[in-house]
Amino acid sequence: MSLTMRLIGRAAKGALDLAKDAVDPDRMVQLSMSGLIEAARTRHEADPAPPWRPGQPLELLLAGYVGTRNTGADVRVEEMIRQFRHVFGDEHLALSVCTIDPALTRGYFRTARQLHIPQIFHKFLYDTVRTHHGVIACEGSMFKSKFANALSTMMVGALGLAAAEDKIAVGYGGEAGSMDESLRRLVEKHCAKALVIARNEESRAILDRPGVPPGPRPETPG
């Protein structure tokens, strides 16, 4: 095959890859989230949000898969709130919980404010993270492509926006697994300044490759 034909072949493959990215819904969600994180970074440099001051309640946004009648997800967040209240005290906290359907979480998460997060979550996170002092990502399956990339993109978005504005950015008890290349790059790009407290050693090892700072080692029985 001539050099010209090889170059044409490579160009055609590149064009096909770009076209695939353009029509891949997961990729579009990731690209738009990444763009808003970069926009938040620029906004913060030009007009930083007021930082936390001693004596103020710490305003934390808890982002997870809440409001779908997924008992495990709801119980996780309920337990996190209990722990935070125990450690910090109610008078030192102002917690907000993202919920997909407020009607399904009515009566949950005592002392926390519930915020409806739309299915197209990008702008909501862009606006809401700015009004808090930090983000706690609560989803157990935090960085995985097993079912769909959208939920993991939401976790990256919440953490990445907080990190871009020099806020608290913590993934609490998260798990990482097999990720599509585009999701892995998104995690690598936007979660390098976040602290992810992994659920197990396997997740720590996976997150170490894209350079996400590890939290304390998970405890093992015995």
Model-derived regions, located:
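Aromatic- and Gly/Pro-rich donor/ligand-binding loops
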Residues: 3-179, 189, 220-222
